[in-house]
């Protein structure tokens, strides 16, 4: 028999900002957003990934709420810019994987787990179009770094994951010629019991206009 699934969502958002005049700018944002299970996860079927792993659907999955609080402080003076941000996310009964062994097979099944939350702090600072060696608007330099701590609380597991990441970008410009270089240590994606590794990124670019 076919099953019907009906979902109703409520997505409130609150934004506050305060101008500190010469001392910078403060911004706060709070929002609640729903996460709806995919139709593929809701099917009551099994799919073999290989000879060992089986993905099992779960028609009992429920929508869960994501709560996000973010606070940022920005400051600019002449060519200098800086931004400090703090963000906390909390997922209530999120849909995350459960992994267990059954009849010699590894079963992967999505379930509404207990909770997932993360706390992130990031600082960015840089100069834009600085004069160097008597050359006007010669140098643009930005650097940023952040730290994220995540907690994953499943029905039968509990994990904590820490990560640092950073990025550096430099650009020099002389008349119609510019040269840019950038390196990014990219964050990995952690959720449930899975860490997805991302490759670091390096880029160089020369331009003439």
Language-model features and meaning:
Residues 56, 62, 81-169:
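Outer membrane beta-barrel strand-and-loop segments of large Gram-negative receptors
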Residues 2, 30-36, 45-46, 67, ...:
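Transmembrane beta-strands of outer-membrane beta-barrel pores
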Residues 1-19, 22-67, 88-105, 111, 136-147, 166-189, 199-207:
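Surface-exposed extracellular loop regions of Gram-negative outer-membrane beta-barrel proteins
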Residues 14-18, 71-75, 86, 121-131, ...:
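Residues on the lipid-exposed face of transmembrane beta-strands in outer-membrane beta-barrel proteins
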Residues 18-26, 75-83, 129-141, 175-178:
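Secondary-structure transition into beta-strands, especially the periplasmic turns and strand N-termini
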Residues 1, 6-8, 44-55, 98-108, ...:
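Flexible, solvent-exposed coil segments and beta strand-coil junctions
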């Amino acid at each position: 028999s076919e099953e019907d699934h009906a979902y109703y969502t409520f997505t409130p958002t609150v934004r506050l900002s305060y101008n500190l005049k010469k001392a910078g700018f403060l911004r706060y944002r709070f929002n609640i957003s729903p996460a709806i299970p995919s139709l593929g996860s809701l099917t009551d079927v099994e799919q073999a990934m290989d000879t060992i792993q089986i993905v099992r659907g779960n028609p009992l999955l429920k929508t869960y709420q994501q709560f996000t609080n973010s606070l940022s402080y920005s400051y600019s003076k002449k060519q200098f810019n800086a931004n400090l941000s703090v963000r906390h996310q909390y997922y209530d009964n999120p849909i995350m994987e459960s992994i267990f062994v059954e009849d010699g097979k590894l079963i992967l099944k999505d379930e509404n787990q207990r909770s997932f939350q993360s706390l992130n702090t990031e600082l960015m600072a840089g100069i834009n179009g600085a004069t160097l060696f008597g050359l006007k608007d010669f140098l643009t330099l930005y650097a940023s770094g952040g730290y994220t701590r995540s907690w994953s609380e499943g029905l039968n597991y509990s994990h904590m994951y820490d990560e640092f990441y950073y990025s550096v970008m430099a650009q020099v410009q002389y008349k119609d010629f510019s040269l840019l270089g950038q390196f990014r240590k990219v964050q990995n994606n952690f959720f449930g019991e899975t860490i997805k590794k991302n490759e670091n990124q390096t880029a160089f670019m020369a331009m003439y206009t």
